[in-house]
Curated annotation (Swiss-Prot):
<dbReference type="InterPro" id="IPR035958">
    <property type="entry name" value="SecB-like_sf"/>
</dbReference>
<dbReference type="InterPro" id="IPR003708">
    <property type="entry name" value="SecB"/>
</dbReference>
<dbReference type="GO" id="GO:0051262">
    <property type="term" value="P:protein tetramerization"/>
</dbReference>
<keyword id="KW-0653">Protein transport</keyword>
<keyword id="KW-0143">Chaperone</keyword>
<keyword id="KW-0813">Transport</keyword>
<keyword id="KW-0963">Cytoplasm</keyword>
<comment type="function">
    <text>One of the proteins required for the normal export of preproteins out of the cell cytoplasm. It is a molecular chaperone that binds to a subset of precursor proteins, maintaining them in a translocation-competent state. It also specifically binds to its receptor SecA.</text>
</comment>
<keyword id="KW-0811">Translocation</keyword>
<dbReference type="GO" id="GO:0015031">
    <property type="term" value="P:protein transport"/>
</dbReference>
<protein>
    <recommendedName>
        <fullName>Protein-export protein SecB</fullName>
    </recommendedName>
</protein>
<comment type="similarity">
    <text>Belongs to the SecB family.</text>
</comment>
<dbReference type="GO" id="GO:0051082">
    <property type="term" value="F:unfolded protein binding"/>
</dbReference>
<dbReference type="GO" id="GO:0006457">
    <property type="term" value="P:protein folding"/>
</dbReference>
<dbReference type="Pfam" id="PF02556">
    <property type="entry name" value="SecB"/>
</dbReference>
<comment type="subunit">
    <text>Homotetramer, a dimer of dimers. One homotetramer interacts with 1 SecA dimer.</text>
</comment>
<dbReference type="GO" id="GO:0005737">
    <property type="term" value="C:cytoplasm"/>
</dbReference>
Length: 159
């Protein structure tokens, strides 16, 4: 085989919103509230091989805003991407799927969250940048130290 055929290949085949849900259980009265809500953000990443060279990576976020014990809104979005990955050493594949792909998907997820919350009638929620590399190594360290680790494809962030 020539050197060209063995060069690593990485391309974005598709970026899409896989799932989106919005709940505003206390509407319309919740719109009368003037207090600043407490916002909780959870972020998960998982990957799946869908054929010989294609992988799906999905970032899922759940954003919950509450005032005292009342939920203002709950938004859950799954931002998916299909990536073609070839000739990448197996040892590096976990890094590509756990760091590079989520870094590509995150701006799309951030935009979807902001747009969805705004369309629901609230001030936008802008997700802060995420260091997926630090999260990857933190999760890896937790997995090595834990008797019941999270699956390697999942990571969680709570703000």
């Amino acid at each position: 085989m020539s050197d060209e055929q063995q060069q690593p290949v990485f391309s974005i085949e598709k970026v899409y919103v896989k799932d989106l849900s919005v709940e505003i259980p206390n509407a319309p009265r919740i719109y009368l509230e003037r207090e600043t809500p407490e916002v909780n953000i959870q972020l998960h990443s998982k990957s799946e091989r869908i054929d010989e060279t294609l992988y799906e990576v999905v970032l899922t976020t759940t954003v919950t805003a509450k005032i005292k014990d009342k939920t203002m809104f709950l938004v859950e979005i799954q931002q998916g991407g299909v990536f073609q990955i070839r000739h990448v050493p197996e040892a590096e594949m976990e890094l590509v799927l756990g760091i590079a792909c989520p870094n590509i998907l995150f701006p799309y997820l951030r935009e979807a969250v902001s747009d969805t919350v705004t369309r629901a009638g609230f001030h936008p929620v802008i997700l802060n940048p995420v260091n997926f590399e630090a999260l990857y190594y933190q999760r890896k360290q937790q997995t090595e130290n834990s008797a019941a680790p999270q699956t390697p494809e999942t990571q969680q962030i709570t703000h």
